[in-house]
Amino acid sequence: MRYTSGAIETLIDEFARLPGIGRKTAQRLCMHMLNEPRTAAEKLAKALLDVKDRVIRCSECQNVTDRDSDPCVLCRSSGRDRTVICVVESPVDLLAFEKTGHYKGLYHVLHGVISPLDGIGPDDIKVRELLARVSRPEESLQVREVVLALNPTVEGETTSLYISRLLKPLGIAVSKIARGIPVGAELEFIDEATLSRAMEGRSAM
């Protein structure tokens, strides 16, 4: 059964488009917003528009950052180990590693993985930017290791293998986080202790 209000149905449909949100959850969110004062809806709308207007991808690591903070705070930090770059699939995965407090190097966010079945090739993710980054004279003198920390899926493994084959001729050591993370699992849902052990136990490819 659908609601008699077209506006309600439209909002439910928009909520349901979000990852992990089914129609029932979308309905609850919609009803919640209906019961909130207009100012709450205005704040939500402003926050959504601000994200689209103010957030960009860092020109160095491709992580998300504010438009007036590029390169991002991690890339600018003098306390990071600039000899190591950890390659992750998404900004959410980067946050997962940061929460461990263990890894102190730099990052590179691919914003996806190679997936031929979905029509996603190497040119559709940030591989070219990674190669350009490690090939710059000032970077090539510093970066000694690239750690591939992609989700343990077929697509993640394919992407890791592709990147390692591109990096090895450059004389950069390539490693992959240790096994122990369940196949098919998403890094954002792995506990911090397991992620720390996976990083510590990384092995050469």
Swiss-Prot record:
Family matches, as InterPro entries: DNA_Rcmb_RecR (IPR000093), Rcmb_RecR (IPR023627), TOPRIM_dom (IPR006171), TOPRIM_RecR (IPR034137)
Ranges where the Toprim domain occurs: 83-182
GO biological process: DNA recombination; DNA repair
Keyword ATP-binding: no
Keyword Cell cycle part of the UniProt annotation: no
The entry's keywords: DNA damage, DNA recombination, DNA repair, Metal-binding, Zinc, Zinc-finger
Zinc finger (C4-type): 58-75
Molecular-function GO terms, alphabetical: DNA binding; zinc ion binding
Functional note: May play a role in DNA repair. It seems to be involved in an RecBC-independent recombinational process of DNA repair. It may act with RecF and RecO.
Family: Belongs to the RecR family.
Protein name: Recombination protein RecR
Organism (species): Chlorobium phaeobacteroides (strain DSM 266 / SMG 266 / 2430)
Source organism phylogeny: Bacteria, Pseudomonadati, Chlorobiota, Chlorobiia, Chlorobiales
